[in-house]
From Swiss-Prot:
Subunit text: Homodimer.
Record-given protein name: Acetate kinase
Pfam annotation, one family: Acetate_kinase
Binding site for ATP: K14, H205, L206, G207, N208, G209, D280, F281, R282, G328, I329, G330, E331, N332
Residues the entry annotates as binding substrate: R90
Residue sites binding Mg(2+) per the record: N7, E380
Requisite cofactors: Mg(2+); Mn(2+)
InterPro entries noted in UniProt: Ac/propionate_kinase, Aliphatic_acid_kin_short-chain, Aliphatic_acid_kinase_CS, ATPase_NBD
One of the protein's GO biological processes: acetyl-CoA biosynthetic process
UniProt subcellular location: Cytoplasm
Amino acid sequence: MKVLVINCGSSSLKYQLFDMTDESVLCKGLVERIGIEGSKLTHKVNGEKLVVEEPMKDHTEAINHVFDALLDEKYGVIKSLDEVSAIGHRVLHGGDKLTESCIIDDKVKDKIREFIKFGPLHNPANLMGIEACEKLAPGKKNIAVFDTAFHQTMPAKTFMYAIPYEYYEDYRLRKFGFHGTSHRYITLRTQQLLGKEDINIITVHLGNGSSIAAVKNGKCYDTSMGLTPLEGLLMGTRSGDLDPTVMTFLMNEKGYSADEMNQILNKKSGVLGVSGISSDFRDLEEEAEKGNDRAQLALDMFIERVKRYIGGYMAELGHVDAICFAGGIGENSSSMRKDILDTFEELGVKLDLEKNNTREEALISADDSKVKVYVVPTNEELMIARDTLELAK
């Protein structure tokens, strides 16, 4: 069985086609600048690539070009769309109503629309991708896999906000959490590595967007992101946790609207805002080595925030089997992992510095560490493909 996985952004689209007999990737690609001048599709297969530069005014035209690439005489990997058993879609926000992956129908689409208020950039784009596939491949099963789903096992004491309770009842204002597909993949893989299902672990997904989850007995117990992906850790451009009065002060002092304030906190803050240089952690490490104090400050603030969450989740869980690093930074930066965990020895977490020097899946803790530490490269697309295969049977 072949499964197509699609991840739609507001002006971009990523895709991968899987052969689920061995979970291999047959091809993958990216469509950029949808609805903007300079639309481009880059399709990769067997180390070769096909580049298509044509106007693509919407997601339907973009997905039509994706289908053409899949069927291309030279760069294609299928002879007919009939070979694709189902299409899996990453959907940002399912709220507390769509708590697991599901076959998409009109009711599901209505619920995705309902949560546009909490995912105004992503949910509309996710819907456009779904509706384009329904139009271009009628009769094909479309499956939704939600970023929020894994976290819906959190108890009320970890997902509620301490604001008047009627705001929760009237507007569902609560923590939902994100990167759930990644945290679920890491959890399932760590269950295999530890040889048991009832595991207590801390999953640390660090990239330009970052989040941490506390997993208790194999289920999400708490997570750092909140109602939206803005809460929690410092990120590339997101502020993370912040005294809300900072916002009201700036709105009063500078005359910012709520939308402008949202833009500042989501797009101009985080390590970019602190450093004034870049949202890319590699750039900051380079600048810090040259003696740039603000670059170093941004990195230090990021590390301290990660430490705070890991330490807090260790207290919440009581017993911790493992801490698992994933994401672009979590998987690739041995120095970041070392700096994050260098104060945890008293809590039973000890790195083996030689083993830590890796970018592959590995156990990187010392033999005498009470808590195991792993690098577990995440694979959200494969997780979506697996769910799609299961539901499409």
